[in-house]
Amino acid sequence: MKKIHIKKPDIKGAIDKLKNLKKEDVIRHFKARKERRARIIEARRNSAFARKMQPVYKFMNRFSLVFHALLACIINFAIEAISRHSLVEAWIYMTGSPLVFLYNAFMIFVTFSIVYLFKRRVFVRIIISVFWMILGIANGYMLLKRVTPFNAQDLKIASDGLSLINKYLDGFEIILFIVGIVAVVVWMISMWRRGGQYDGKIHHVRALIGIVVCAVLYVFVSNQAVDKRVVSTYFGNIAFAYEDYGLPYCFMASVFNTGIDEPSGYSKKTMEEIGQNGKLTESKITNAKTKKTKPNILFVQLESYFDVDNAEFFKTSQDVCPNLHKMFKKYSTGYFKVPSVGAGTANTEFEVLTGMNLRYFGPGEYPYKTMLKDHTCESAATALGKLGYGTHALHNNGGNFYSRARVFNNIGFDSFTSKEFMNILQLTENGWAKDAVLVQHIMDAMNSTKENDFVFTVSLQGHGDYPTEKVIQNPRITVSGIDDEALKNKWEYYVNQVYEMDQFAGNLIKAVEKRKEPTVVVFYGDHLPTMGLKAEDLKSRYLYNTNYVIWDNLGLKKQDRNIPSYQIMSEVFERLGIHSGTLFNYHQTRRKTKNYLSDLELLQYDILYGKQYVYNGKKPITEGHMKMGIRNVTLKNVVPHLDEGYSLYGENFTKSSKVFVNDEKQDSTFLNNTRIDLDETELKNGDKISIVQMGSSDTVFRKSDEYIYKDGKLTVQKGTGTDTTKSWVPQADGDK
C-alpha cells in the first residue's frame, strides 16, 4: 500500500515572497489572471456544447419576451402545485380562475424584465426563478406545519434564526434544508461560470425604459384587477386568500401593502372637525349609578366559538352550550361580525380593544405585529384606566404569541397573565390548554386591585387543527348527519371542546356572582372554526358571524342586535354611560351618521400613522407600564438531596419557572407550584439564586428577588427582581 505524503507548507518562503512583492508583480498577476479567464471563456464559447447551444441562445434572445411569459406561467403553476401539495389542485386553480392565474404569472413576468440590464441573462433568469421557487417551497412547507401561509411576518421574525428553524424543522429536515441550500448555491455558481453570455451590446437606457414600462403596466393591471374584483385588497382569511388569489399576489401584498394609506382630505382642519374640537378625547361617566359603583367590565374572547345550533348540516346528541343559551334568552345578544374566518384571533382582539376597523389596513395584515408591537396606542385599557379602573389581560397561551406581551404593554394594560404564569394541568387531546384554568386567574386579577377592574381574557381551548381521527373515546356529545368519517370526527372533537368552554363560561359567572360586585361580562367568539365551512352551511348565511352575549347583574335592558367587533366596546360603554376613548366616543356619536366609515378611516390614520391632530398634543399613552403576572414568585428554603442536587421550595412556581444561579440558567425539573429540583447544580456559600418566568426565545417576563445561599439557608435581597411598578419590556430588553 502506497503512503500518502503531504508536502510541508513553505511558510518562510511565502513570507519572503510577500516581503519582496512589488507593485509590478501584482499588476502582472491580475493581468495574467484576466488573460487566463478570457482564454477559458473563449474555449467554452468554442466548445461542442456551446456550439450546440448557440441556436438556443439566439432563439431565446430573439423571442425572449415570449420565453419569459411561458417561463412565468410554468413557475406560477409550479409554486401553486407546491403550495397546494397537489398538481390536480393547481390545475383546478389555473383553469377555474384563469384571470387570477394570468395576473400572478404577469407579476412574475415583470420581474424578468431586469435581465436586459445584464450580459449573463441566463444566470439572472435562474436567480429570479430560484427566488420564486423558494417562495413556493417555503409556503408549501409552512402549510404542512400550520394553517397560516408563508408571509411577510415570517421574514420579520427571521432574525430569531435558530428558534424559528427549530420550531418548524426536525433534525433530519434541517440536514435536508442545509444540503438543499448548498446544492442550489453550487449549481448557481456553476451556471454563473458556465452559463452563456449575451454577445450583443447592452442598451442600458432601453432596458431601464422597458423596466419602467413593465412596472407602470403592472400597476395599471393591478388596479384593474382590484376594480374588476379579480383580486381583493381585503383578506378575511389569509389562508383562503392564498388559495383564491395565488401566492405571488398575496405574498407581495403582505410585504408592500401594510398600514393605512393617507386618505384624501386628511388635514388638521378636517381632523378638528371629526374630533368635534376636542370632545372625542374627553373621558367621563354620565350614568349616576355607574359613576357611583364603577362596575367591573369583563370581556371573554372564546377561541373559534360559535353557536353550533347555527350549523344546518349536523345535529348533536345534547345541547352543546346550555349556559350560554340560557344567557342568550335573558341578556343582550346577536350575531358578532368579525374580520376573519377560520383564523386571525389577534385581529378580532385588535378591533375589540381599539375600536378600529381592520378593513383599512393591508390585506392579511396583523396590526399587532406591524404596528402595536413597537408603538403605543390608546385602547379600552387606557380609556378605562383614565376613569380609575385596574386593567388586566389574560391568555392561557404563550405571552409572545402574536407579540401580545409587548402589544398589551403598549396599549395601556396594568398586567398580563399569560401561560407562563399559570399551572395548567388539563390539556385537550390536541395539546391546547383547557379554559377552566382561567376562572381562578381572572379572580386573582380582580383581587389584585382595590378599585374595580377591566379584565380582557383570551381563551384557547377551541383552537384547531381538529383531528380527523377519533381521539375522544367516550365523548359526552356525539354528532350525527355527517357521512364523512374524518369530518365527523373533527366536528365531534370541536363540539366537545365547545361544551367545556361553555362550562367555563358558566363557572366564571358563578364566581362573579359570589363576589357580589356590580359586573358586566361579555362573551363572544373570535372567528368560525377552521372546518371549511360555506355560507350555505349556516343559518346566518354569512361566514364572518359568530355570537356574543352581554351578561350583567345591573338590570340592563335586553337589547338584541347584530354588531361588528370594532363597535362592541363602545356599545357596552354606552349602555353603562361611559364616554371615554377617542374611537369609542366616535362610534357612540357617529355610528348612524353620514360619512361615518370614511371619517373613521381618517381618524384611524391620524391616530396610528398621521400627525395625531385629534389629540391636540395630549396623547393618551406615551409609554407602557405593564407588569407580567399578578403573583410574586418566592423562595422559602432549599433542601439538599442525599446524593447530589437540591430541592427548592417556594410559591407560585410554574413550568415556565427557570432557576438562575449567579445569573446562569440551571438545568431544573418542575414538580409542582411549590417545588423545583436542581439535579446537577452544586451550591456554594454566597451564590445568588433567582427564579425567572421565561417565555419563548428565552424572554424574561419576570424575575424574582435574588436569594443569597449560605450554610443551607436563603436570605432574600429585596428590590433585586423585576420592578413591577414599571414596564416589563425595557427591563427584559436590558437583561437580554
Where are these regions (language model features)?
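Transmembrane and membrane-interface helices of multi-pass
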Residues: E35-Y242, N685-K688
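Membrane-interface segments at or immediately adjacent to transmembrane helices
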Residues: V221-F299
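Membrane-interface micro-motifs in multi-pass membrane enzymes
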Residues: A152-L155, I238-F251, G342-A343, A433
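Exposed alpha-helical structural elements
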Residues: D10, D25, I157-D160, N323, ...
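Residue-level preference for non-acidic, small/hydrophobic
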Residues: G161, I297-E303
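N-terminal targeting leaders characterized by basic, low-complexity, disordered sequences
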Residues: M1-A38
